[in-house]
Amino acid sequence: GDVYKRQDEEREEIYVVGSVFKIQVYSLSGNYKRTLNLPYDMSFEQVFDYDKDSLIFNDGREDVDNPVQKGTYYYLMSKTDGGMRPLPFHVKYRITNRFRIRLRNGDRQGVISCMFSVKPLLKNGDEVILSEFSNDTVFSYGKEGAKPLLVRTPAPRSTFPLKLMSVSACSRRFLFLDVIEKVYRRNIKKLDGDSFVYDYREKEIFTPVLVNSDFIPELPVEIDNMNGSFPKYAGASSIHSREFMQYYRRGNLQGRACEAASCLTRDDIYVLVLYHFN
């Protein structure tokens, strides 16, 4: 699986998620300090820095033969000793972002598995947005507990095929949503869904068009906050430095993008662009 890290500058620690079963903790200088282990019947799917004492994660373990499971999948984990505390969300009939198909050919059998790009957790500053695929309500969870953000209608299990919905970014007024049908299609390389925005003020849903006006002409933007910890009400996208410099040399950048390009070196690989929504 992928190796990724979370950093806590106040504790001067880095949390490396190199396995679905454990997190290794290092100092900022790279010295190993300790390991945080999961019980045998759990696995990490998403992990985020939550506060000075805790990480937050969801359990990715799935029993395809028993969809009615223990019902608790979201936890806070102590950064010190790995102790866990469940979040107050109970799921009876879980819907996951994974697809598994059992194939049989005579005496031989196998399993095809894939994972959809939508994910249930999103870090939003000091809060976490939880769009559990089985629930009809999207919540924001923080110091003051859970707060409902959006109620799905119709409910998830009343649609066929199932539609997985997650939050990709948010502002005080808008909630950015990704929706994808949970359908297996043969010989497809990428499973794309649809993007929508819910407007709290107008109480309407529409299809967004996001562009970066620092590019000439304006560059379409795809927000991807799923795997990072970003400031509240912000969105992130990335562009390869080589492509970014091509825009710069052709004179197709202006404003802060032009300033950023002038500072790049040959050691820079990707440029992270942070968008703040009003």
Model-derived regions, located:
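Short, small-residue-biased leader/transition segments that mark boundaries at the very start
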Residues: 1-4
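Asp-box/WD-like beta-propeller blade repeats and closely related beta-sheet repeat scaffolds
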Residues: 17-72, 86-102
